[in-house]
């Protein structure tokens, strides 16, 4: 990842070692400034990133607030902020990605590169939005609000700190818990995870095995990982956002928030890019087809199946009781991981999920649909109904001779539901 472009280094004392390392990594130009001039430097330079070189609090709280506001409200591509910190201290700016000052400078550069990859992706999305608007005369519906609202953090642990960690994390993030590394691995494959906390209760060998799984999968290259206890140093190069932390839950949450927000923002950008590349066919919130596109695709599939005498089945997944917005989104995103390549689906207006199985008869569709419903039931989170079991029901219909799009939809919306096991 290229680091070219102006970057501001904020420090009241010379930060020669860090500046030299940045220069060697390809950062140019580097603008050094003191805290008193940081706001003016940000406005004048319009940097690609801001680096807080000195650990500890900002010397002036008002300056820190103003600089934070300037960075957060800057138009165009995001400006990552990375701050050196001591131990489990919080960063000088609340929006800054923390980097332990006691670690080698190479670790700092790796975290900077990770953040700059997100900035580059954001720039690509903004360009595609402009192109989309020029050619189509409209903008697709794009997600808004804090990306942290989309985030899910996985806590793996079974020691005495696990309950406190769960409470602290649950107050700030959507959270998944795992009492074993095997369960944690299942969650990673089934859900969109934006941060991982490896808690106490695991042997060093188990922790190393789990981190090895993360390091070998490019999907988890930039995911924030907080390891309570000693983190093996071998993973620093492949996992730039791995940290060793102590067991204080509140400090851990404060350290994780900026990193998790950045990762969730990256995931949002990837969904938006998919939407733009397909001219608005996919919903950037769920990753499934939009409702209108699903209707068009199903209409074509019905006509094609009728002409070629091939099978076509349709499933509707509904849930007992009202779903909150987060649970509805989680179930839809989970479906994107379970759907077969030749099938397609969407989220309906009431939160139910529609899934079309092409070239699949009723018997085969029944097997696949029940498996999907069972996985949704097991993995979906409903924070407002934490004590209730989520019952996912499946309604199935298959194409018959003389069927049309409307008749098939009427049957799947009104036929008898089969409760998922």
State where each predicted segment sits.
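Conserved phosphotransfer microenvironments
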Residues: 34-39, 48-76, 85-87, 194-221, ...
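Alpha4 helix (beta4-alpha4-beta5 surface) of REC/receiver domains from two-component response regulators
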Residues: 20, 58-72, 79-106, 208-209, ...
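Receiver (REC) domain switch/output surface
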Residues: 104-136, 238, 248-268, 272, ...
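Active-site-proximal structural segments of metal-dependent nucleotidyl cyclase/transferase enzymes
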Residues: 295-322
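Catalytic-core segments of nucleotide cyclases and related cyclic-nucleotide turnover enzymes
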Residues: 362-370, 397-421
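Non-catalytic signal-transmission and effector/linker regions of two-component phosphorelay proteins
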Residues: 1-28, 43-44, 72, 110-152, ...
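Conserved nucleotide-binding and Mg2+-coordinating catalytic segments in signaling enzymes
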Residues: 276-296, 317
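Conserved helix-loop-beta segment at the catalytic/binding core of cyclic-nucleotide signaling proteins
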Residues: 281, 332-365, 374, 378-383
């Amino acid at each position: 990842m290229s680091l070219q472009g102006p970057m501001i280094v904020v420090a009241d004392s010379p930060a020669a070692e860090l500046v030299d390392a940045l220069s060697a990594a390809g950062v140019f130009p580097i603008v050094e400034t003191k805290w008193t001039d940081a706001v003016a430097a940000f406005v004048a330079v319009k940097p690609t990133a801001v680096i807080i070189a000195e650990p500890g609090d900002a010397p002036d709280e008002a300056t820190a607030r103003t600089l934070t506001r300037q960075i957060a409200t800057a138009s165009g591509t995001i400006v990552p902020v990375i701050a050196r910190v001591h131990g489990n201290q919080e960063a000088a700016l609340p929006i800054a990605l923390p980097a332990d000052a006691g670690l080698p400078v190479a670790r700092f550069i790796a975290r900077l590169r990770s953040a700059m990859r997100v900035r580059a992706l954001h720039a690509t999305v903004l360009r595609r939005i402009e192109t989309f608007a020029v050619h189509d005369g409209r903008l697709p519906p794009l997600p808004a609000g804090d990306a942290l609202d989309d985030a899910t953090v996985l806590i793996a642990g079974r020691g005495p700190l696990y309950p406190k960690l769960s409470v602290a994390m649950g107050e700030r993030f959507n959270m998944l818990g795992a009492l074993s590394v095997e369960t944690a691995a299942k969650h990673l494959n089934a859900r969109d995870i934006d941060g991982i906390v490896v808690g106490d209760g695991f042997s060093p060998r188990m922790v190393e095995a789990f981190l090895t799984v993360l390091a070998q999968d490019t999907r988890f290259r930039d995911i924030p990982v907080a390891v309570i206890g000693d983190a093996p140093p071998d993973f620093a190069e492949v996992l730039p956002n791995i940290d060793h932390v102590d067991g204080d839950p509140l400090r851990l949450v404060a350290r994780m928030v900026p990193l998790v927000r950045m990762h969730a923002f990256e995931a949002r950008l990837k969904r938006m890019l998919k939407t733009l590349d397909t001219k608005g066919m996919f919903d950037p919130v769920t990753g499934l087809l939009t409702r209108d596109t699903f209707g068009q695709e199903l209409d074509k599939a019905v006509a094609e199946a009728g002409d070629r005498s091939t099978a076509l089945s349709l499933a509707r997944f509904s849930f007992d009781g009202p779903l909150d917005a987060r649970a509805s989104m989680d179930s839809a995103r989970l479906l994107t991981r379970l759907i077969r390549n030749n099938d397609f689906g969407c989220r309906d207006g009431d939160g139910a999920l529609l899934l079309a199985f092409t070239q699949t008869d009723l018997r085969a569709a029944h097997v696949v649909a029940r498996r999907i419903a069972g996985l949704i039931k097991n993995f979906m989170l409903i924070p407002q109904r934490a004590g209730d079991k989520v019952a996912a029901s499946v309604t199935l219909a298959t194409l018959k001779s003389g069927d049309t799009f409307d008749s098939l939809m009427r049957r799947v919306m009104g036929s008898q539901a089969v409760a998922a096991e």
